[in-house]
Design a protein with these regions (language model features):
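Single conserved hydrophobic/aromatic residue that forms the stacking wall/gate
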Residues: 138-148
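Catalytic P-loop NTPase motifs of RecA-like helicase/translocase cores
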Residues: 72, 110-111
Length: 148
């Protein structure tokens, strides 16, 4: 894993990159851990805004998964948001190996304005995207739990 705050310090622009995008706490890092079959590969947290860099994960010699910081986190400072916007713009505009974006949305809050903006961002840079609705499992009390 390699995290960068400046795209010039990113791994070589080769092979195939698939970017994981979405609002804070939409399940990007959890999905990455699931795909890699390693629960500790990407840092997860119940607190939004933990991923602060673009994190590159080498899956094979040819394939990288790229975990982006979540967007839409209201407590992010104006300066941090501006830096994040600049970083994302430089990533999407410069990476020739970027094949597609997987945009994660919590099924309880799908298609927020920030999700639409990310889709428009992908369209601007001609990056195909795949929307994925994630399910946040909530605790079901015993009396309401179905019997299977």
């Amino acid at each position: 894993m390699q995290g960068v705050l400046n795209i010039k310090k990113a791994p070589p622009d080769e092979g195939f990159e698939f970017v994981l995008a979405g609002r804070s706490n939409a399940g990007k890092s959890s999905a990455l851990n699931c795909l890699a079959k390693n629960k500790k590969l990407a840092r997860t947290s119940k607190t939004p805004g933990r991923t602060t860099e673009i994190n590159f994960f080498k899956v094979t010699e040819e394939i990288k998964l790229v975990d982006l910081p979540g967007y839409g986190f209201s407590k992010m400072s104006v300066d941090k948001k501006k830096n994040l916007d600049t970083l994302l713009d430089s990533y999407f505009s410069s990476r020739q190996s970027l094949c597609a974006a997987i945009i994660f949305m919590d099924i309880r809050h799908p298609l927020k304005n920030s999700d639409i903006q990310m889709m428009e961002f992908c369209h601007k840079y001609e990056v195909p995207f795949i929307p994925v609705l994630t399910l946040s499992l909530i605790h079901i009390s015993e009396p309401t739990r179905p019997n299977f």
